[in-house]
Amino acid sequence: RGIWKIIPCQLMIFTREEYQHRLKKVQKMMQEKGIELLISHDTNNINYLTGYDAWSFYYAQCAIVHVNAEEPLCFVRAQDAGGAYIKSYLKNENILVYDEEYIHNWPSHPYDQLVDIIKERNWEKLSIGLEMDAHYFTAYCYEKIKLGLPNAKLKDSERLVNWARLVKSDTEISYMKSAAQISERGMKTAMDVINPGIRQCDAVGEIQKTLFRGTEEFGGEYSSIATLLPTGKGTSASHLTATQDKFVEGEATII
């Protein structure tokens, strides 16, 4: 683990002050809901609270917010520790790394270590808010917390962080405007390349290329969802992805 601590800089797209403002806003909402400790599993909320945004959400990870803490904690697997050190604004000691031995090694689970961390900090009797409907917060995650912390008062946080994210800062709005410019270019490419006789996958390739290239000022990256391109009778099913079939004249296409 120590090798990651020599990384010389953090690559943050928001200032430390903005992250601190977000934390204070979330902590105020926690107080209002009677939550002393928040375990946030939603990958977007983890990013909002810490800056961490690696593509690692498919396995257990979370941000942990104590109602009186100066920083949240970021709980990630060892393989992804470097990403947390690079992308988050947190001090090294607030990045908590669990061993790879917990991966696919049932009945062991990363939240076994999370429970131990909570006990070590004497938080096991607190009122703990959980994101009960968050993607990838599995039933097993919940069971580990429930069984491991029998004296805690567990409650649904009711999308607390999601509501905090609702009001955007000037910097966030600026980034959204940049993203809109990239989306506009992607839509123009789609209008240009979708024609009868063209394969759907070829059109998607051009659209993705445009989205990744971005603008002269802002580069793009992968989109938040696969490029959906239902066409013909597929337009009755909104979330179909492209195939190698060709576009047919007179058929509708959803971009």
Which residue stretches match the model-derived regions?
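A composition/biophysics-driven feature that prefers long, compositionally simple stretches
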Residues: 4-185
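Short catalytic-site patches enriched in acidic/histidine residues
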Residues: 46-56, 158-163, 167, 198-255
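Generic secondary-structure signature for well-ordered alpha-helical cores
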Residues: 119, 150, 178-188, 192-199, ...
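Short aromatic/hydrophobic contact patches that present stacked aromatics
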Residues: 129, 191, 228
